[in-house]
């Protein structure tokens, strides 16, 4: 198996999300889908997409929505973790 570019834990989660979303929905995610899942701002998602593209982990067509394509095999991806913000509230009496 040829070596794959290294990626950080956070980058791996984005890559795993792109793969899982594409498998479930038969189309790549929009940046808005990633924003909702990871609960981050639009600029954060956009910068991550640009970074993944610069590192040769994804390819996309400029000015074409939902055009993200993974350039690494699924076996090289980490398991996608569920991102949940746990909020607790206290009842005040």
Where are these regions (language model features)?
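Pre-recognition alpha-helix immediately N-terminal to the DNA-recognition helix
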Residues: 13-20
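Short helix-capping/hinge SLiMs at alpha-helix to coil transitions
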Residues: 20-26
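A short alpha-helical element within helix-turn-helix/winged-helix DNA-binding domains
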Residues: 28-38
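Glycine-centered, phosphate/nucleic-acid-interacting loop/turn motifs that mediate DNA/RNA or nucleotide
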Residues: 56
């Amino acid at each position: 198996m040829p070596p794959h570019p290294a990626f950080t834990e956070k980058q791996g989660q984005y890559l795993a999300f792109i793969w899982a979303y594409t498998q479930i929905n038969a189309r790549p995610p929009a940046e808005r889908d990633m924003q909702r899942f990871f609960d981050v701002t639009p600029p954060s998602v956009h910068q991550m997409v640009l970074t993944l593209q610069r590192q040769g982990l994804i390819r996309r067509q400029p000015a074409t929505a939902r055009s993200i394509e993974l350039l690494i095999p699924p076996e090289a991806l980490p398991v996608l973790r569920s991102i949940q913000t746990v909020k607790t509230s206290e009842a005040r009496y």
